[in-house]
Amino acid sequence: NYTKVPLVIHETFFYTSDTLKNGGREMFGFLKKKNEVVENNTMYAVANGTVIPISEVNDPVFSQKMMGDGYAVVPENGEIYAPIEGEVLSVFQTKHAIGLKMTNGLEILLHMGIDTVELNGAPFTIKVKAGDQVTADTVVAIADLEAIKAAGKGTEMVVIITNMDKVAQFSLEKTGVVTAGTPVGSATAN
């Protein structure tokens, strides 16, 4: 009991010399979109623990937003996850920080602990490298929280947007006890 209805699809192509040089691939949007990345503005909890506003971090460089806006997680255990969907830009030689880039172009610094640069990487096992693609369920590092505490350092995992000039809006929407990978905020690029 189907009715046959004619379907007419009409497409107009405008050829340019660039289109012809590239074998006409630009004519077909579906070929081009295969490599496009969908923007994701969501920021996630990097560990099981307690999310706090960056203003509550016990270090003025972070709490006064000198490096940018963001949030922190006081972790319950040492499994540290990516705070965003995107790409790893760099891993600091001292292993205490990882630079990332969101799919929307915003740059994020995951700073593991307070003053942990002085520990020369000892309490951190890094699980990613520059160029890796990450999601909220990607473990980026294992932090030995007991070693960090024994050295007299804070264990807060601080997530900072470092290129604030490119931010249209940042909002921290969830604080308190969370599990790793829980959406806690968003950052949109301008």
Task: Identify what each model region corresponds to.
Residues 24-190:
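Contiguous, well-folded functional domains in the mature portion of proteins
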Residues 1-26:
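Short, Lys/Arg-enriched N-terminal segments with co-localized hydrophobic residues
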